[in-house]
């Protein structure tokens, strides 16, 4: 390689490369030019590899010149890249301009789910009249869910279409009554509790879901009467719906774990008892089942049914939430639609 010719070519090469860098309009263009001159097969790289063809006297001189040229190109590349990036940022800021005079956006806040809100209200009202709260497992045995509650082996509630059975002879509780059995086994009267929680049944439609919430109540003592049961439930319903003149009625019914048993109706809160689609034009809405605890249940937990007496009741939390908030489809509570849920906050 002729020394003077190589030097002339090197100067032309640097000038041409810098001109290309200065005319580049994008980072992509810069990378292509960089590869052309500074890449593994670029022209500067080829010149550096050609140093071995020079004489020992020429090699250090040309090596220094080529490295200087390489440094000039790298500086030009960095300068142009910074310029293009600043230009791109300015254009982006112009497109996404921020008006600092606008008020700030607050952080979104969550709210209490309407079913949870209803459950809290129920617990608070019963707590105000002396009831404690008891909880228990959601996976139960046949004994606690059925046998101890006087539900015979051939009772329809034990069928697969009503109950979720799991391995090991266990099942998902179909009501929170098992909590009462656990509690009575471990506590002596007087007993005055409610048992809120999730329960499970094989059912799904407009008014039923496979999982829902119940609150069951129990009062065991020496002189608890059916009139006390009526007084507690009437007081609760009138406070829950905030209607002091709410009409109620008790109808005879049957439950294996209570005797006598009754179902409680209230005057339809949608039409004030006049009759509408919600109440089936009857003017009444069924809200809960209740009764005096059956002697067989007492015997299963070791209590003397001659000495102690009590009442029990059970109500659906979603049912009361639907009536309180005017919701006509139970499934809306579990679809996680924020448009629906935000109405309650």
Curated annotation (Swiss-Prot):
This is Phenylalanine--tRNA ligase alpha subunit. The keyword Membrane does not apply. It comes from Nitrosomonas europaea (strain ATCC 19718 / CIP 103999 / KCTC 2705 / NBRC 14298). One of its GO terms (biological process) is phenylalanyl-tRNA aminoacylation. Mg(2+) binds at residue 259. Its cofactor is Mg(2+). Tetramer of two alpha and two beta subunits. The gene is pheS. Its EC number is 6.1.1.20. Pfam families: Phe_tRNA-synt_N (PF02912), tRNA-synt_2d (PF01409). One of its GO terms (molecular function) is tRNA binding. GO terms for cellular component: cytoplasm. Binds 2 magnesium ions per tetramer. CDD domains: PheRS_alpha_core. It is found in: Cytoplasm. It catalyses: tRNA(Phe) + L-phenylalanine + ATP = L-phenylalanyl-tRNA(Phe) + AMP + diphosphate + H(+). Keywords: Aminoacyl-tRNA synthetase, ATP-binding, Cytoplasm, Ligase, Magnesium, Metal-binding, Nucleotide-binding, Protein biosynthesis. Belongs to the class-II aminoacyl-tRNA synthetase family. Phe-tRNA synthetase alpha subunit type 1 subfamily.
């Amino acid at each position: 390689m002729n020394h003077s010719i190589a030097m002339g070519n090197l100067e032309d090469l640097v000038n041409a490369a810098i001109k290309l860098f200065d005319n580049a309009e994008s980072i992509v263009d810069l990378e292509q030019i960089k590869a052309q001159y500074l890449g593994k097969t670029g022209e500067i790289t080829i010149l550096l590899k050609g140093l071995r063809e020079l004489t020992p006297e020429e090699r250090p001189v040309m090596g220094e010149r080529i490295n200087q040229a390489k440094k000039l190109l790298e500086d030009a590349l960095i300068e142009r890249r910074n310029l293009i990036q600043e230009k791109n940022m300015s254009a982006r800021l112009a497109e996404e301009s921020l008006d600092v005079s606008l008020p700030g956006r607050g952080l979104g806040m969550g709210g209490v789910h309407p079913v949870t809100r209803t459950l809290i209200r129920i617990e608070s009202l019963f707590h105000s009249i002396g009831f404690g709260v008891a909880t228990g497992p959601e996976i139960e045995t046949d004994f606690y869910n059925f046998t101890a509650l006087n539900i015979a082996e051939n009772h329809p509630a034990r069928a697969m279409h009503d109950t979720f059975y799991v391995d090991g002879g266990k099942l998902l509780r179909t009501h929170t009554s098992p909590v009462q059995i656990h509690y009575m086994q471990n506590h002596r009267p007087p007993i005055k509790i409610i048992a809120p929680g999730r329960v499970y049944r094989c059912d799904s439609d407009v008014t039923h879901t496979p999982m829902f919430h119940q609150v069951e109540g129990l009062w065991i003592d020496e002189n608890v009467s059916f009139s006390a049961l009526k007084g507690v439930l009437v007081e609760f319903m009138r406070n829950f719906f905030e209607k002091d003149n709410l009409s109620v009625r008790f109808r005879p019914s049957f439950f294996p774990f209570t005797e006598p048993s009754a179902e409680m109706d209230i005057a339809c809160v949608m039409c004030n008892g006049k009759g509408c689609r919600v109440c089936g034009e009857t003017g009444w809405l069924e809200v809960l089942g209740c009764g005096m605890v059956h002697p067989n249940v007492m015997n299963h937990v070791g209590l003397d049914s001659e000495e102690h007496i009590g009442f029990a009741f059970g109500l659906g939390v979603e049912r009361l939430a639907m009536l309180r908030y005017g919701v006509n489809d139970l499934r809306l509570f579990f679809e996680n639609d924020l448009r629906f849920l935000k109405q309650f906050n």
